[in-house]
Amino acid sequence: MAERGNDIRPGQVLDHNGALYLVVKTMHTQPGKGGAYIQAELKNLKTGAKYQERFRADGYVNRAIIEEVSFQYIFGDSSSLTLMNTENYEQISIPVELLGDKSVYLQENMILTLLFHKGQVISAKVPDYVVLEVVEAESVIKGQTASSSYKSAVLENGRRVSVPPFIKVGEKIVIYTPDDTYYERAKD
């Protein structure tokens, strides 16, 4: 589906130069001389390689037709995951590499979003927010205001994140998975 270059947005998938690319970020530029263009950071969905591309604002790009389907995580091993479609209960197996480094967030019965292009799975995403328990946290010295207001903590999945000083071992916190950061203390 052809779309104007000016309408490119992060999160879209483009069919560009014979490959599928995820638009990571965009910036509209209007130079003093010449036509406006969109500077886009693209990620190749097959290889994972990122690169910069310029699109004319008044030109056209091919947007890939993508279908998003929700699947429930059932079980997995080091190389593949078995998932169940939440609508028709069909089970499929996908390589764990489709999740990349976000596979550490997998939890039993978690709902994943799979992206399909022409019947093939091209990408998988964990939810944006995941609740995890803090298993290790640095101690904070009272009145310590000269240094950063965050401390390092280790989560139950082994991931290390920065958390506010009031977070203690055993507490559950919400992690924003796209950038692996603390979001808030989990509500009971």
From Swiss-Prot:
It comes from the Bacteria. One of its GO terms (cellular component) is cytoplasm. Pathway: Protein biosynthesis; polypeptide chain elongation. InterPro entries: Elong-fact-P_C, NA-bd_OB-fold, Rib_uL2_dom2, Transl_elong_fac_P/YeiP, Transl_elong_KOW-like, Transl_elong_P/YeiP_cen, Transl_elong_P/YeiP_CS, Transl_elongation_fac_P. The keyword Ribosomal protein does not apply. Keywords: Cytoplasm, Elongation factor, Protein biosynthesis. HAMAP family: EF_P. PANTHER family: ELONGATION FACTOR P (PTHR30053), TRANSLATION ELONGATION FACTOR KOW-LIKE DOMAIN-CONTAINING PROTEIN (PTHR30053:SF14). This is Elongation factor P. It comes from Anaplasma phagocytophilum (strain HZ). The lineage of its organism: Bacteria, Pseudomonadati, Pseudomonadota, Alphaproteobacteria, Rickettsiales. The gene is efp.
